[in-house]
């Protein structure tokens, strides 16, 4: 009963919040449609993140000047500073969603909030170079500004706590992408809303089988051995 589920999107493309569209710089997230595999019925909150926030923090976490600020001003450990480089653009956006959600629900040290870090900054080194060219050389004062404005300064704007009617409205948007354009059966669409046991619960019941397939894939590719 105490569990809340939030989903994020780019403020520049507020499909969930406003049935909107547009371009944005939060790479690695879907936009302009509601994914078939999004269980909208159990979603409690929709949160929009300004893509400028994630861009600024990407530079804060991944430049020498930004890391100097984190170490000397915020007294973060070298280990934590290193871990912040694991966050890519969409991962940073997810963390910002957590901050906004925590502020909205007035969470405290007695609460737990979690998210998924879907990418790494290693994928975006060229983007960091572009930001340096666009905004000029980074410095500690700018790092301080970015931290205070684009992280500490986040507010509870551009989010929505979803009612049952809100959720159904968002779910119904799937029709235009998946039934009209992708020839899915409308019965299957309705099942995603009305037949939780036969759809979402059935997927969760396959966890052990999916883990086995993941292990087989990792073994075949040698991915884990290379880490």
Segments (PLM) and residue ranges:
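Secondary-structure boundary elements
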Residues: 1-4, 104-108
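Glycine-rich phosphate/adenylate-binding loop
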Residues: 60-103, 109-122
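Short, well-ordered loop/turn elements at secondary-structure boundaries
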Residues: 42, 108-109
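Active-site/ligand-binding loops adjacent to catalytic centers
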Residues: 2-86, 127-227
């Amino acid at each position: 009963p105490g569990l809340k589920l939030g989903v994020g999107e780019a403020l520049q493309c507020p499909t969930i919040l406003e049935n909107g569209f547009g371009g944005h710089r939060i790479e690695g997230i879907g936009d302009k449609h509601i994914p078939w595999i999004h269980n909208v019925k159990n979603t409690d909150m929709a949160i929009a993140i300004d893509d400028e926030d994630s861009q600024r923090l990407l530079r804060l976490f991944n430049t020498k000047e930004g890391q100097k600020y984190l170490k000397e001003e915020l007294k973060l450990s070298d280990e934590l500073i290193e871990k912040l480089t694991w966050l890519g653009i969409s991962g940073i956006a997810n963390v910002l969603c957590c901050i906004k959600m925590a502020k909205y629900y007035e969470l405290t040290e007695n609460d737990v909030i979690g998210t998924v870090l879907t990418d790494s900054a290693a994928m975006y080194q060229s983007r960091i170079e572009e930001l340096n060219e666009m905004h000029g050389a980074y410095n500690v004062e700018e790092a301080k500004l970015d931290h205070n404005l684009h992280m500490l300064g986040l507010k509870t704007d551009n989010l929505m706590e979803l009612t049952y009617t809100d959720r159904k409205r968002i779910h119904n948007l799937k029709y235009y992408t998946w039934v009209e354009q992708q020839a899915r059966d409308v019965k299957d669409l309705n099942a995603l809303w009305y037949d939780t046991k036969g759809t979402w619960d059935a997927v969760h019941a396959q966890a052990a089988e999916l883990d086995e397939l993941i292990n087989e894939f990792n073994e075949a590719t040698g991915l884990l051995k290379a880490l």
